[in-house]
């Protein structure tokens, strides 16, 4: 297997990352386990998930699969999409990020997530609120690194600028 450094973090990840979007929906638990095991046998140590994948089922299945080998793996998850019926269970507000992270940690059966992504840019929440919340969670050790998924380049640049200005995790 080929491993690469993940940016300037110093951690090494397999060149391929296994996405788990199909876990719990298109792929039942047995099919998900077969895919996961094939990846592990091939040396893959990098697994991507999100709270909204199969409305949490993907995280639950992945959490069961990583038991016993968690420390060897790089696990990602994401926050933003609607979970349940609560009107505030979506977006990048402090309330939703914290609630979503706690639920993801429980489903993944882990005390931390290696990379926690904002799944989308949230135009309704102040970027300062979002980034301060993520910085707090990095400080608490619940997430190791933060990331952005499905952001335009200008949105990433703006987030990096705000994080740098406040000396927050970026």
Language-model features: locations:
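Glycine/proline-rich, positively charged
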Residues: 27, 37, 41, 84-170
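N-terminal binding-site loop/beta-alpha segment at the start of enzyme catalytic domains
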Residues: 1-74
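Ser/Thr-centric signal marking residues that sit
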Residues: 9, 45, 49, 77, ...
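A cross-domain feature marking catalytic cores of carbohydrate-active enzymes
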Residues: 20, 49-51, 77-79, 120, ...
């Amino acid at each position: 297997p080929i491993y690469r450094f993940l940016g300037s973090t110093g951690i090494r990840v397999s060149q391929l990352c296994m996405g788990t979007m199909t876990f719990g929906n298109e792929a039942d638990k047995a099919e998900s386990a077969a895919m996961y095991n094939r990846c592990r046998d091939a040396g893959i140590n990098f697994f991507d998930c999100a709270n909204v994948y199969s409305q949490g089922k993907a995280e639950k299945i992945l959490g069961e699969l990583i038991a016993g080998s968690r420390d060897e793996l790089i696990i990602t998850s994401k926050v933003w999409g609607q979970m349940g019926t609560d009107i505030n269970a979506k977006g990048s507000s402090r309330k939703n990020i914290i609630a979503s992270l706690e639920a993801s940690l429980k489903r993944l059966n882990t005390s931390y997530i290696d990379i926690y992504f904002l799944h989308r840019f949230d135009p309704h929440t102040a970027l300062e609120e979002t980034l301060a919340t993520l910085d707090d969670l990095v400080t608490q050790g619940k997430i190791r690194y933060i990331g952005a998924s499905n952001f335009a380049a200008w949105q990433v640049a703006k987030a990096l600028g705000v994080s740098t200005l406040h000396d927050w995790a970026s």
